[in-house]
């Protein structure tokens, strides 16, 4: 489902200017709030900086979606379906006793998505989004490097003097260094958050720039991701690098992405037949720092999947999932958590939205300048989605995913800002110019 010609006209007439004027302060406000570690309690709600921003701009964003100025796309309805099903699942299991969780969960699932749909409707707004995400990563970087070396969380210590902050997670060193948590609740969340910027910085901010420029900027993102010492975050970077390499090596092939999908599908079938355990377990076993972690993830997948099969419609809510007593209750797989907590319909809604985004953007006929924008966007989204198989994401990192999903749909009907037909420009010039005996009035 794509926007009609009339909708595109309305977008050009009103949406762009509105998006630019609003985005001039909402985008930096949102991304700076993502990296603020302070929160407070109000009427049973845990409110942080980014949650306040989402609550303030949720209604305006929905109004801008309802007026049709940005068009209507299938992922819009699928994201709404995902959010409504999560609420329904919690009400099914716990009644309205979890009303505060349901309210915040609904806003975190839909707010970032529809704010992105409202604000990002052209190339300029998309570039501003990437720039502010990059700035957020850079602002966290020196504090994270310091924690990586000294194990001192300057950010959390500093903000703890003015309010309640996330607790510092005591984790054992890796590779002789300490895991940087930044202003996030966990090093994993910090690392995954930073990793999303890699391809976007390379292809969007680095578009038409020198190789040195791209490496210097994207290198900062890699460093920020590295100091989290999170295998899941590193995986996101590796996936993006792999896709970038594939694109360059097989640039001469028209169907290179189809070939990659066929190869990955064939590899999965081969492992399913030839390996002594499911591919998902192999994936978990080899993408970890320690064998004990791999063993734990395999057991999580086995026991939690069984619970999903036994409770396919509404999941388990916040009820305990079946596991041995010696296992912790955390589930290091975002997609599995969605199915386990809310049921398979919630997972299907969310995954379907992502697949549809790939399909409609892959088929979009873009001007040559915007091809790199699409690559950066899809590569970053792919890295996030694959990393989410090995980690669970929540809080600001989850909101970043939802924002990212809504941030790329403008490209479906995008035109370069300089693509106005010459004939229209000439006609416009002729209408503006008024001649007198002294020459054109404009002179």
Task: Set out the residue ranges of the language-model regions.
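Hydrophobic transmembrane alpha-helices and their immediate junctions
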Residues: 211-214, 222, 238-248, 342-385, ...
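Long extracytoplasmic/lumenal interhelical loops at the membrane interface
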Residues: 277-345, 357, 361-369
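Interfacial loop-to-transmembrane-helix boundary motif in multi-pass membrane proteins
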Residues: 22-26, 74-83, 116-158
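Alpha-helical transmembrane segments of multi-pass inner-membrane proteins
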Residues: 130-247, 359-360
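Membrane-interface helix-loop-helix junctions at transmembrane boundaries of multi-pass membrane enzymes
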Residues: 15-22, 62-77, 203-217, 248-258, ...
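N-terminal hydrophobic segments of proteins, predominantly signal-anchor/transmembrane helices
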Residues: 20-42, 51-111, 271, 384-387, ...
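A membrane-periplasm/extracellular boundary helix in multi-pass inner-membrane enzymes
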Residues: 142, 146-152, 245-288, 305-310, ...
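Transmembrane alpha-helices of multi-pass inner-membrane enzymes
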Residues: 56, 258, 376-387, 392-443
